[in-house]
């Protein structure tokens, strides 16, 4: 079974970011101990919505997200504080549309590299690129993105690793959608990747099988990524 992921966009109310950052300290701590947890990596939007958060949650089995994480006393306590402080922009509560979630299976790629000395750092720069293929063409889109992973992986070696994550995620509900999750050591490293020949060639290769795309950028500040789940292999 492929690892299960949720990419969460959380739309905060004006000025809410400092309190969100506080709430995520215990949430990140408890997440790392949960049996199925592999990733729980959070950042602040840098595309003009500073009170919006972006988080990647990863689990060895979907039960970790739908049942395990929300069942913890820490989660219930912190979500109560979120509601009391009205940290969501439009509607409070777990059912709020301000929790904008996409559900994925890992398709291909890497979230960490064993030769990256900073692979566990909490302050990387993240770009999530959503792609939508024409009807019936997602398989080709996924294949093209996966070929790009291999080229990117081969382009760097220790000790000079700047591209820390380059993962192709297959959306579970939208059968035309895929997301490329990119994590670099800094924003400058992301800008360097964007202007590189290898990245431009990938975007060019994708054009025939891509109808629409969106780029969302964030600066990470807490969490863990690609750990072995405490429960062990599933």
Residue ranges and their predicted role:
Residues 1-234:
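Short S/T/G/P-rich N-terminal loop/turn motif that feeds into the first structured element of a domain
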């Amino acid at each position: 079974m492929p690892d299960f992921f949720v990419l969460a966009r959380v739309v905060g109310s004006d000025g809410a970011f400092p309190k969100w950052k506080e709430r995520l300290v215990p949430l990140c701590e408890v997440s790392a101990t949960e049996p199925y947890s592999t990733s729980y990596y959070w950042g602040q939007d840098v595309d003009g919505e500073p009170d919006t958060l972006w988080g990647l949650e990863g689990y060895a089995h979907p039960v970790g997200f739908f049942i395990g994480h929300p069942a913890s006393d820490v989660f219930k306590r912190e979500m109560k504080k979120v509601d009391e402080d009205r940290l969501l922009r439009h509607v409070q509560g777990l059912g709020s549309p301000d929790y904008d979630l996409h559900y994925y299976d890992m398709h291909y790629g890497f979230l960490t590299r064993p030769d990256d000395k900073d692979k566990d750092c909490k302050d990387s720069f993240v770009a999530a690129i959503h792609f939508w293929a024409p009807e019936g063409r997602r398989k080709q889109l996924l294949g093209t993105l996966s070929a790009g992973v291999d080229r990117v992986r081969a382009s760097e070696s220790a000790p000079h690793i700047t591209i820390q994550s380059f993962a192709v995620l297959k959306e579970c509900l939208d059968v035309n959608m895929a997301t490329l999750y990119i994590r670099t050591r800094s924003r400058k490293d992301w800008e360097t990747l964007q202007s590189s020949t290898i990245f431009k060639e990938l975007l060019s290769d994708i054009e025939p099988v891509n109808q629409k795309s969106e780029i969302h950028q964030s600066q990470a500040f807490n969490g863990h990524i690609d750990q072995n789940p405490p429960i062990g292999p599933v």
